[in-house]
């Protein structure tokens, strides 16, 4: 799994002009699923994201997790994180998992994360528009294959 984690003041995802999910302070996750991803990757990602201390404490030090601040997550599927740009000018996405497998793992990831923090989500495979106000900015890339 490849996940772009962005600390946000607020974020929303819309489909055809209708808001599908929205959060206030928390994390926007752009979630890509690879063909070799398994339950262990989901467990690792959920544990890291829910405990990652990237929110400021009263002294301004990044010392608090999403759980500590009572924040929420907006999770958006993003197969383009597996783009291969080595050849030519058009990216290839053959490194991403097939849609049926990716959808199942994405749903499992969100369900596990939702046991720890509130989760709003986009619609898998839909053409979505994302609005956000970055906080920091703080942007972290988590790759479950690089542990």
From Swiss-Prot:
User: Where does the record say this protein resides?
Assistant: Cytoplasm
State the UniProt keywords alphabetically.
Cytoplasm, Hydrolase, RNA-binding, tRNA-binding
Stored CDD domains: Dtyr_deacylase (cd00563)
One cellular-component annotation, GO: cytoplasm
> What Enzyme Commission number(s) apply to this enzyme?
3.1.1.96
Indicate the family of this protein: Belongs to the DTD family.
Free-text function comment from the UniProt entry: An aminoacyl-tRNA editing enzyme that deacylates mischarged D-aminoacyl-tRNAs. Also deacylates mischarged glycyl-tRNA(Ala), protecting cells against glycine mischarging by AlaRS. Acts via tRNA-based rather than protein-based catalysis; rejects L-amino acids rather than detecting D-amino acids in the active site. By recycling D-aminoacyl-tRNA to D-amino acids and free tRNA molecules, this enzyme counteracts the toxicity associated with the formation of D-aminoacyl-tRNA entities in vivo and helps enforce protein L-homochirality.
**Entry protein name:** D-aminoacyl-tRNA deacylase
Q: Which organism is this entry from? A: Streptococcus equi subsp. zooepidemicus (strain H70)
């Amino acid at each position: 799994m490849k996940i772009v984690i962005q600390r946000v003041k607020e974020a929303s995802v819309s489909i055809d002009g209708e808001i599908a999910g929205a959060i206030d302070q928390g994390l926007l996750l752009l979630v890509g699923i690879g063909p070799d991803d398994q339950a262990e990757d989901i467990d690792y990602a959920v544990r890291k994201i829910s405990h990652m201390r990237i929110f400021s404490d009263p002294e301004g030090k990044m010392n608090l997790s999403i759980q500590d601040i009572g924040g929420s997550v907006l999770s958006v599927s993003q197969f383009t994180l597996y783009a291969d740009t080595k050849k030519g000018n058009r990216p290839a996405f053959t490194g991403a998992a097939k849609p049926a497998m990716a959808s199942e793992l994405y749903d499992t990831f969100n369900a596990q994360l939702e046991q720890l923090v509130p989760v709003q989500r986009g619609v898998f495979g839909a053409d979505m528009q994302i609005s956000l106000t970055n906080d920091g900015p703080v942007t972290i890339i988590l790759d479950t294959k690089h542990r």
